[in-house]
Amino acid sequence: MARVCQVTGKAPMVGNNVSHANNKTKRRFLPNLQNRRFWSESENRWIRLRVSNAALRTIDKKGIDVVVSELRARGEKV
């Protein structure tokens, strides 16, 4: 399973660890992904999504039914 948010599309980024001596080594910044299930009133069922913490805030703001309809419009299976 890819480390990608289903709602926002956030994926790992590449950057550097920087020491006090300014030595740089490559590292990955991973999105804060959570496996969550949301209750959809309109569909009367639970919907499982792998979402980032930022996407949880988006779902709180817009509502799960709006977010799921946007996912389906993009062609994702939910």
Swiss-Prot record:
UniProt xrefs under HAMAP family: Ribosomal_bL28
Coiled-coil stretches noted in the UniProt entry, renumbered to this chain: none
Keywords: Ribonucleoprotein, Ribosomal protein
Signal sequence segment: none
Family matches, as SUPFAM superfamilies: L28p-like
Cited InterPro entries: Ribosomal_bL28, Ribosomal_bL28/bL31-like_sf, Ribosomal_bL28_bact-type, Ribosomal_bL28_sf
Entry GO MF terms: structural constituent of ribosome
Top-rank taxon: Bacteria
Family annotation (PANTHER family): 39S RIBOSOMAL PROTEIN L28, MITOCHONDRIAL (PTHR13528), LARGE RIBOSOMAL SUBUNIT PROTEIN BL28M (PTHR13528:SF2)
Family under the similarity heading: Belongs to the bacterial ribosomal protein bL28 family.
One of the protein's GO biological processes: translation
GO cellular component, as recorded: cytosolic large ribosomal subunit
Protein name (record): Large ribosomal subunit protein bL28
Organism: Aromatoleum aromaticum (strain DSM 19018 / LMG 30748 / EbN1) (Azoarcus sp. (strain EbN1))
